[in-house]
Amino acid sequence: FDPITNGHLDVLARACRLFDRVIVAVASDNSSKKVTFSVDDRVRLIQENVSDLPQVSVESFSGLLVDYARKTEASVIVRGLRAVSDFEYEFQMGQMNRHLDSELETIFLMPNEKYFFTSSNLIKQVHLHGGRETHDLVPQNVLEALRQVVEQRDNQES
């Protein structure tokens, strides 16, 4: 969710058709990734796009997702799959989560095919290298936030 994309929102809408309560869990201490937006900004950007989904809450967490799922009494983790390349990583994560908590299920949902190639990293790279044609791939508030990131970077470089 760094940043949230329309692909994420599509998977979230699909999850809402399956579950009465959906928690968007935003990791606050993912030290293996360099993030563009703070956890508070990521939570805010998501919240601004799910206000019409009453069963959705957006929360940050630290530590293992499986521990957070236990704490919130979630029994299912929903993950989006865009391509076969996603499956290997997601399969390993799902298996590890099952090893850590045999009661926790992982289900995979595919987004609409128009979002198969969309990723947060690709969107950021396009913006950081001067591209702007991502209005159909991310919500408007994310576009504005990305423009601010690019402006701040450009101001620091000049």
What are these regions (language model features)?
Residues F1-S158:
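Nucleotidyltransferase catalytic core that binds NTPs
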